[in-house]
UniProtKB/Swiss-Prot annotation:
Binds 1 zinc ion per subunit. Belongs to the peptidase M48B family. This is Protease HtpX homolog. It holds the Pfam family Peptidase_M48. The active site is at E136. GO terms for cellular component: plasma membrane. It is found in: Cell membrane. Its EC number is 3.4.24.-. Its cofactor is Zn(2+). One of its GO terms (molecular function) is metalloendopeptidase activity.
Length: 306
């Protein structure tokens, strides 16, 4: 099981982001007023997105809330899993796109929403859909929207501190007054590299939370193999029926169960999701540990049909 390691990794990544903030803050002169201003800016710029995350994400996807009569299977699964977790049932939405995907959003359990695309409902069977919904519910129960908001706020602070170092130099510390702070080259490196480093750490936190949702969701459903099979189908479906790239879909892509926009090579470092094959391998290992028997990973030949 990787849960405790993932939690430690998330904590260490946040600590690293804070260390970067402290380093750049020190380089800018260590003014508490400056740091306070940028922290407030970071909180303000992310608060709205966090507080209204459910409304913004749903609107971005053009999704609509559905009744139990319209989506009885989803309601049955979500009601069962919510009751099992001892949590209130979220609202259910369906997005009008044939690209298979799903996401959960909301600042807490009482303001949560789960959204499935029309495409995912067509390619997954009930067992696989249950695995996906378990994953999404755990994003809500693990407060991953809040985690993402904090990471985003810290990245914003780092960016502003970098720009401050670029435009205002190293402040008034005696040991830097005579040398012009870190110098132009140091300032340029800071303004360029600091936001990149912050973004890399932010994406690493996101990938860690995906692994946690995979594991915790599988513990909730008791069926990691179902989620592995679902991810396999979703990955294939995203290639054959790609999601249209718009400002709305891009803003929600980090919340989705699988990255709808392919990331290859160096760009994987900036991906919000771990590689699908690695997620599947972990899930199959988890299934093996739970069942006590080796289970072969799903192959591409299993991606069609229900």
């Amino acid at each position: 099981m990787h849960g405790h390691f993932n939690g430690l990794k998330t904590t260490l990544l946040f600590a690293l982001m804070w260390a970067i903030i402290m380093l750049i803050w020190w380089a800018t002169g260590g003014s508490r007023q400056t740091l306070s201003i940028y922290i407030v800016i970071g909180l303000i710029t992310t608060f709205g997105t966090y507080w209204f995350s459910d409304k913004l994400a749903i609107a971005s996807m053009g999704a609509r809330e559905v009744s139990e009569q319209e989506a009885p299977e989803i309601y049955q699964i979500v009601r069962e899993l919510s009751a099992k977790a001892g949590k209130p049932m979220p609202r259910i939405y369906i997005a009008p796109t044939m690209s298979p995907n799903a996401f959960a959003t909301g600042r807490n359990e009482r303001h949560a929403a789960v959204c499935c695309t029309q495409g995912i409902l067509q390619i997954l069977n009930a067992r696989e859909l249950r695995g996906v919904l378990g994953h999404e519910l755990m994003h809500v129960y693990n407060h991953d929207i809040l985690t993402s908001a904090i990471a985003s706020a810290m990245a914003t602070v780092i960016s502003y501190l970098g720009y401050s170092l670029m435009y205002f130099g190293g402040g008034s510390r005696d040991d830097r007054d005579s040398s012009g702070g870190l110098g132009l080259i140091g300032a340029l490196l800071s303004v360029i590299l600091a936001p990149i480093a912050a973004s890399l750490i932010q994406m690493a936190i996101s990938r860690t939370r995906e692994y946690d949702a995979d594991e915790d969701g599988s513990l909730l459903t008791g069926d990691p193999e179902a989620l592995a099979s679902a991810l396999n189908k979703i990955s294939y479906g995203a290639q054959t029926t790609p999601m249209r790239k718009t400002a709305g879909t891009q803003s929600v892509s980090a919340m989705m169960i699988a990255n709808p926009f392919s990331a290859v090579g160096f760009s994987r470092l900036f991906s919000t999701h771990p590689p699908t094959d690695e997620r599947i391998a972990r899930l199959m290992q988890m299934a093996n540990e739970m069942n006590g028997t080796p289970i072969a990973p799903p192959t591409y030949s299993t991606r069609v049909g229900r």
